[in-house]
Amino acid sequence: MVFKYLFFLTILAVSCEKKPVAGGTQDEAADVRIVWESPQQVVSTGGGYPRVHRLNDGRLMMSYSKSYNGYARFSEDEGLSWPETSIVNPMSKFTESNEKGNALLSVAVPDFAQLSENHPHHPGRIIFAGNYRPRSTDGKTTGLTTVHPYTISISVSDDNGKTWSDTRHIYMSDRWKENVTIGCWEPFVLELPDGTVQIYFADETPYYKKGSNWQNISVIESNDGGHTWSKPRVVSQNGSGRDGMPVVILLDDRIYMAIETSEPGTRLYPVVVSNTIEENWRTPVLKDSPYRFHPFRKSLKSDVVYSGAPYIITTDNYIVYSYQIADISDDKNDNDSRHAAMEVQVCPKSDAHDGCFDTMRASSRPIDLDQWTETAVWNSLCDLGDDQILAVSQYNGYVYIVRGKIILKE
């Protein structure tokens, strides 16, 4: 009888698990819209910060973090299936000890890129980047920076993701005199047309040394396919707050970088900074630069609404920009990542001129959810071709994808 009762409770729990449904447009007046299909769960036992990119052989690869490790899996059918048998573990947690104690170095916010088939040094190499974060060995306390600094690290594969190199640390913040959650964050990997490999990341290090909580976006570069890396140079800093969470695209002769930023009195909000490929951030893009701009018809800058964690891609005909938005209350204390939904806007590529675009529109939400009890956060996008996209989301602690099609409204 007890067994039957427990079996009934198990079935009830499974049947009552919240399942996401497809979202829709928030902007009925726009001339373009995204038609979303039903969300599909990919990782069955948790997972976060998912990213999907197409490989040179046509497959899709997804990176994500889970249980303090960095994982990847693959799809051979445009994202319809992601077999468990395809899972690999490019980057693993480890422990570190010194006179200050013991720390678990967990892998967070992984990203990757496959180098082009005509790369001058390592054609087809996959560079998997992760952010090692020091925490207590039980995982409950973050910021054990007296033991080990926050670190940007890579692992590489030269056989299309079958096997992976040992992990290498390529940028380390400082080991501080006290335990603080201060360091470097959120790597993003990009290859320039000449084969230069770039890793962008957010960095608090130089400011914390001076007693400030500012943060910049920096970049390090490799001219030999990932063997050696330059010292960081600052890409952007707004002069009064924090730039964070960089994601970068190439369009025509320019580099466009989506970031979240803030100023005194504002919540985090998304913007874009740009530079020519030739200029390549020789000087930082600062607050008043014409190449730091609001890409939306209606700016998301607010002292109440939170809209951070941006992502940007291009399709055949469009620029697509996503962010997570918490707008459920007039009280800003309710509007944070615990109550955020994924939102997406688009504009034609042809709207980009002179290093700027400001016509993003047709806001829509790939997953329809109750923001008081559900979240869709740390999202990303992937171009599938023919103006079809994947929205990729950490929905309630699980990895989901949603297929969408961008169409002109009749």
Predicted regions and their residues:
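Sec-dependent signal peptide recognition
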Residues: 1-8
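Intrinsically disordered, low-complexity regions
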Residues: 8-9, 293
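C-terminal motif of bacterial Sec signal peptides marking the signal peptidase cleavage site
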Residues: 14-15
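Ser/Thr/Gly/Pro-rich low-complexity, disordered linker/stalk segments of secreted
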Residues: 19-23
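Asp-box/BNR beta-propeller blade signature and adjacent active/binding-site loops
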Residues: 24-410
